[in-house]
Structures are given as C-alpha cells and as structure tokens.
Amino acid sequence: MVDVAIENGHALVTIDNPPVNPLSVSVRQGLMDAVRRVNEAKCETAAIVCAGRTFVAGGDISEFAGPPPLPHLPDVLDAIEASPTPFIAVMHGTVLGGGLELALACAWRIADEKTRFGLPEVNLGLIPGAGGTQRLPRVIGLERAARMAANGKPVNTKTFEEFGGLDLVFSGDPTQALAAFRAALPARPVNTSDRSVENADLTALKAEIAKSAKGADAPMIALETTALAATLPFAEGSKIERQTHLELRASAQSRALRRLFFASRSVTRPDRLKAFTPAAINHVVIVGGGLMGAGIAAASLAAGHRVTILERDTESAEAGRGRVEAIIAKDLESGRITESKAEARRASLSAGANYAAAFDADIAIEAVFEDPEVKRAVFAELAAVMSETALIATNTSYLDPNLISEGMPGPGRFLGLHFFSPANIMKLVEVVGTSATADQSMATAFAFARGLGKIPVETGVCDGFIGNRILSAYRRQADYMVADGASPYEVDKAMRKLGMPLGPYELQDRTGLQISWANRKRQLAAGTWPGRYVDI
C-alpha cells in the first residue's frame, strides 16, 4: 500500500489504498517504513503522492470502534516532520482529516487547482486526533483554523492558498509540477510544530458555532481545542487533542454518527442490484412544476441531464420553468455555480404542456397532487408516448405505487422515487419498488439518484414509506400536545431546544399543509387513522 522509489537523491512515496487512500494501519506502517528508508538513504527530498482519484481523504473509520492499533498516526506524522529529509505533500482530490494532518506535517505542500481541504471530523462527532487542531493554526492562523475544525466544511485550493496553506498550486501533470518545485526548492521552513500562533478573539465564532451545532458536542470542543494552540506548546496541545479525540470516539454521539456514516453508504448500493448495469439517463421529464417538481428538475440539471417540465397548460409550464430558473439564479448569486454553468442549465431546460415531448425521455417523474386518480392519469399519458425501457416514477409521499401503476403497459418499469422538499437540497430519496418492478429498473433508479448526489434508500410499500412514516408519528404526538393545551409555538421551541433545526409546525408551514391534510382525511375515511383524530 506504500511504495518508495529513490532516484537521484529524491524519494517518491506513493500511497495506494483505494478507493480514497485512508490511513489504515497498513498505510501507517508503510509510511513509518518509508521514513526509515528515506533517512537511511539521506535523500535530499521525499514527496508523498497518492494513486487514484484523491490524496488521503481521512483515517480508517472502521478502526474507531476499538483501541487504535500501532503505529498511531500522531507518531507517524511526528516522524515525517522530524526527518532530516524534508517531505513534500503533492495533493489532488480531497485532502480531509488525517490527509490534511499528514500534509501539515510535511515541510511543503503543493496541490492541484481543483483540490479541496478540510477537517470534517466533527461530522462524525469527533475532533482531529493527530495534531490537526494544533498544526493548522500554526500554518493558516487561529481564527481560520478554528473555523475549519469547528464547522467541518472543506475549502477550495484558492481559499487554502490565500490562507497560506500552500507553497504551490498547479494544473495538469503533478509529476512535472513536483519536478519544477524541486528544481527551485526554497529553503526548508521551520517545522510546523515549532511555529508560534498569534492569539485571536474567537467570541463571534463561538456564538456562531453554538448556534449551528444544535446539540452536537464536537464542534465547540474542536474550537476550544484549536484555541489551545495559542497558549500551549505543540506537544501539550497535541496531547490534549489526542486524549479528547479518543474520549469522543466512545461517546454516544460519535457512535451514532459513525453508524449513520456507514449505513448511508451501504444502503445506496443494494447487493442484489450489483449484478445489473444501470441504463444511461440523458433526458429527464418532470410532470408538475410546483415546489417539488422544480426542485427535482434543478437537481437533475445540476447533474448534467436535459430536463423537460410538463404541466396541464402552457401558463403553468412557464411558471414551473420560472421556479427552476429562480433556483439556478440563487445558486449563481451565492457563488455555488458560475455564469457559464447557470447558462448551460438554463439551456438544458424546457417546459410545455404536450406529453409528446416525453417520447425520448429515459425517466419521467410525476410530482403532481397527492391524488391516486390524478397520478394514474399522468402515468397513462406517459406510458402512451415513452419507450417501454424508460422508467416511469411517482413521487408520492404516502400512496401505494402498485395502485398508481396497476394495469399499465410494461409494469417492470414503474416504481416510486420519493424526494423530500426542497428536492434540490435534501439528500434522501426513497426508492419504492412495486410488486412488478424489475431489478434492472431499480438498479437504474438507484444510479440516477446517486448521480444527483442523493442518498437513495430502498423501502417497501407502506403508508408513508420510511421518512413520512416517522414524521407522521412525530407530528401526531405534537398534535396531541396541542390538543391538550400546548401552543404550536411552544412545541416548536421545545423541539428546537432539543436540537431539531425546525419544530414540527414550522416544518409544515414551510413544506405546505395540503399533503398532510389530504393524508389524514384519506386515513380517516379508510378507517386506518392510527390514533385519536385531532381537529386542527
């Protein structure tokens, strides 16, 4: 997993641990051996590169459940930093967590112009554990480092270079960039751990993190640990960081977040579907240009698809187009996309009222009103013009996809794809197979959702599937509290205090009351209402 090649007094240390080159125990041991070989050879420089699509993207999370095996990462990084041979980190892809800690232990850092850098440990209920909170402020300053450690968000190459974190930015061949850097090698800088840190007022940042953490412990701990770099020697600060990191590994929050991390990856590729090659998706049709349909359309455009919005009349279709263009404009205004990307998305969007426009679509998703007969009518229109190999999906929140697709030609292509609003932002997509849905169709649907940057989860046919089934129980208990005398404002406040980003009534106000109201009426009429009826 770690190869060392020495030529003309220069060493090339290559990490090859696909898919994201995590710092597993074998990689750590390989790096220790590499340092020893480089020292013995008295190399002039040693460069660390990674095979594949990225530099080291973190530690091996699977090791976090038990005692960390030797060698420990802090010891590896200390050995790299203390080596008589200066190391150069040659980076591309994502340099995250232990990967950034590795780079910070090197004398110099050079990176491809499209690289991203971050300390995302807080997203797993942790803080860095190999000097990240102590070395980073010694390179880019205390406030910037504290922000990166506490919010867990990566920064791009341009930003990290402006922070002072890079010695060279390159585009193209990293081998040529490394050769050019070595040819004009600057004097070796002071080791990162030996640098001082200027103190900074973190009061505003603490208030910001306290507000955004919403009950999570790790963000504030990461900030406070990073702040130690301004008052303690590196060795003392690193010792506290390591001890805190190990304590957090055993915390309930971190265990839960790590479980979620692994679960959210395993569910996106069901084992039984791995034998199927997903069909290519080029043209996406969305029937219904309301809030949900516009969000799905925007997500599809962002993924590079051609999108057509179909509505009941031209006026409604143009209104749907306007909603999608508003999302594109907001992304442009916020800097998430460039003008050229915005224009490309607008050019890939069309809208109309003629179902004939769906004749060459690879997938159509209906996002119309939550009424089974309305949805069946849409399915019939789509089935009449689309290829029998194209997917036809319902975005229903509660209804049985079997009933919506019953009697339609080509039953193997029908399924449910339930997005959550706003669909251009929310990650979860429930993939609901009918009794007749083909595994090939399911494989294509999963691949399509992954391509949108979503987390697709297979669910069986039941009222509300997974997300709304949970939400219904949550909302039902909230309604009982209101019926017993609490106000909706009090319920919302209590849930926000618990850590929810929104209370149940705020959430309903934002997403709309129609679907919930229609569902309660449907359940009451069918005699399936699961509790006492609340007339609000």
Model-derived segments and their meaning:
Residues 107:
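A short alpha->beta transition loop at the rim of the catalytic pocket in nucleotide-sugar-dependent
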